[in-house]
């Protein structure tokens, strides 16, 4: 069964190592029958803790469609890529959003923002009272 997946990949931060590992990941995806790639590069970030003695890494998110039977073999091959520090592949779920819920949420946001704006702007009676005191 073909499913939509989203993979988050963490590579070494060096430019050449990053590009070669990214190409290797793409080759493996194609080899296991992945289609409809959508790539999103997040860029280089500092890591919260060292991963394989690396303090910085480059993140790449790739969305693709693939048969679910090939996922285990793909993960086994991804573990062999030297400059790929970590990866996570998730099934992408498209949720249907009810129009009623969206309208209700938008109304609540409008109502809350309206209340905040009224509190920020002084009413005329408060301004008149301040003028009479002074």
Curated annotation (Swiss-Prot):
Bias (Basic and acidic residues): 113-122
GO biological process: translation
Keywords for the protein's UniProt record, in alphabetical order: Ribonucleoprotein, Ribosomal protein, RNA-binding, rRNA-binding
Pfam families assigned to the protein according to its UniProt record, in alphabetical order: Ribosomal_S6
UniProt cross-references to CDD domains, sorted A to Z: bS6
Coiled coil stretches, renumbered: none
GO CC annotation terms, alphabetical: ribonucleoprotein complex; ribosome
InterPro entries to which the protein is assigned, alphabetical: Ribosomal_bS6, Ribosomal_bS6_sf, Ribosomal_S6_plastid/chlpt, Transl_elong_EF1B/ribsomal_bS6
Function: Binds together with bS18 to 16S ribosomal RNA.
NCBIfam families (UniProt xref): S6
Name of the protein described by the UniProt record: Small ribosomal subunit protein bS6
Gene: rpsF
